[in-house]
Amino acid sequence: DVDYWLNILPKNKELNNLSTSNNNIQIKKHNFTPIFIIGVPRCGSTLIEKIIASGPQYVSIGEETGILSTLVKQKIIEQKAIYFNIKDMRTELIQRYKEKNLIQQNSNYIFTDKTLDNFFYISLIKAIFPLSKIINCTREPLSSIMSILKNNLPNLPWAHDLDHIFRYFDI
């Protein structure tokens, strides 16, 4: 829904005012080090993810999981705000990443999540996964906008109207 992406989510102040006083997250004595790739669609994020995956260390590839955005949207809809326990949220997120087979021992608990709209959740990501890395993938905006229009992205409700696209880029 366009209203959610352009109005409700960007105005949610709780997402930007989270405590980051959590200790390192450990499960079975292993630290989780996700790599979040953020940006706008058609910004080159797939190339970045492939470069990361081609390195010598095994890294589980998350593509666009939408795990965090789905969970946050669920919390916003259920509670009209997202006051929640970070530890509970962490447990729920780790379980969802495990269900997608992203958290694997042979990857040394490093995985990528290329859900580009995770830029809305940077404070939340750092509170839940303090060891995480965040890569902001950028491209000349006009090139991204033209590519978004040309590719007719069906899963992005805001990507089919030029005014909506400009508003999304202004967030």
Roles of regions detected by a PLM:
Residues I61, I67-F84, Q105-F111, T115-I171:
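PAPS-dependent sulfotransferase catalytic domain
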